[in-house]
């Protein structure tokens, strides 16, 4: 997962340092996530927001059927 996150950040001309700042987390905290490859849904939703992309589930025809966004974090208190 870490490679995909880094790849998206690179495509969007950003990096892990900017992601840490965007999420109000310390650089060591993000470095630990990278080392452990321990990303959660909240991390991915915030990454999507930062990179102006969408996080979704696609059906077998590649049609989006569910989108995840910050409202989902509020509903679940994550």
Predicted regions mapped to residue ranges:
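Key DNA-contacting residues within the recognition helix of helix-turn-helix
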Residues: 6, 31-32, 45, 59
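Residue-level signal for the short linker/turn that defines the boundary of a DNA-recognition helix
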Residues: 3, 13-15, 39
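Short, charged recognition helix plus adjacent turn
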Residues: 56-78
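N-terminal-biased segments
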Residues: 1-7
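DNA major-groove recognition helix of helix-turn-helix/homeodomain DNA-binding modules
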Residues: 42-58
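The alpha-helix within a helix-turn-helix
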Residues: 9, 20, 48
């Amino acid at each position: 997962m870490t490679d995909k996150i880094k790849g998206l950040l690179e495509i969007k001309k950003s990096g892990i340092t900017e992601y840490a700042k965007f999420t109000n987390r310390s650089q060591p905290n993000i470095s630990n996530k990278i080392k452990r490859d321990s990303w959660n849904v909240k991390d991915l939703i915030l990454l999507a927001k930062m990179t102006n992309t969408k996080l979704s589930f696609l059906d077998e025809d590649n049609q989006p059927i569910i989108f995840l966004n910050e409202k989902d974090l509020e509903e679940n208190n994550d």
